[in-house]
Amino acid sequence: PVDGGGGVVHEQHKSNYYAMFHCGVAYQLTGDKKYAAYVGDMLEAYAKLYPTLGFHPLQLSPVPGRLFWQTLNESVWLVHTAVAYDCIYNTLSSKQRATIEKNLFVPMADFIMDGMGDNHANNKTFNKMHNHATWATAAVGMIGFAMNREDYVKKALYGSDGTGKRGGFIRQMDYLFSPDGYFTEGAYYQRYAIWPFVIFAQCIENKLPDLKIFNYRDSILSKALSTLIQLSYEGEFFHINDALLKGLSAQELVYAVDILYNVNP
C-alpha cells in the first residue's frame, strides 16, 4: 500500500476484490475449479501480506486502513471477498481455511471493528449511523457467517456491545431511512449503501430466517430501493450532498434490484 484513491496500488486491490467476487460466483455457476483455485491462491497471498501491514503510510484519514488509505475501503474489500470465500469454501482444505482466517479475515474484521494500536477510531465508525458503518457491519457480519463466527454476526447486527442500543445493522435500518425509505445522506449515498444493506440482508435471510429481515420495518429495504429509483432524472441521481455522477446503471443498484426482485418478484 502506497497511494490513495485512484492510485495504481489502490486500484489493483480494488480489481483484486472484484476478480475474487466474480470468480467465486462463476465457480458456483459453472463448477469449474479454475475459478475457485484463482480465489484460493489470491486469498493465500493476502494471508501472507496482511499480517505485515501497519497503518497505511499515506495518513490522509483519521480512520486509516491497512490495505487502503481509509478503513471504508477495507470494509468494501471484505464485503466482496466474503462472498468469494463463501463460494469456494468447500474447495479449500481445513489447513488452508485455518490459515486464511487466522492471518487475514479475523485480523481484518477485528481491525474494522476496533482499529489497532493507539487508534481505535474504527470502533466509533463501526457503531455510527452512517454509510461507512453500513459497509463495516456488512463486512464483519458476512465474513462472520462464512467463518461460522456467531460473535461477529451479533456485533454486526447489534453493535459492538451487542445490545442494539449503540449501533449495528438493525439500528441503521431504523435510523438511516424515513418511513418511506428516503436515506438521510441523499440519493448518491443511498446508491452507495444500498448494496451492503441488501446483500447482507440476503445473507441474514439465508442464515437467520426467523429475523424476517426483508419484512423489517414494513419492508424498509424494498422502500429504500423504490425511493432511490425515484430520486433520479433521465437516469441520473439528483446531486444532493457531495454527489458525483452516478445513475440507474450503477452496479450497486443493479445488484440490489436483482436481490430484492428475487425476494418479491
Give residue ranges: language-model regions:
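Low-complexity, Ser/Thr/Pro/Gly-enriched N-terminal "stalk/linker" regions
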Residues: P1-V2
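Aromatic-lined, polymer-binding surfaces characteristic
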Residues: V9-L225
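C-terminal, helix-dominated tail/subdomain
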Residues: P209-P265
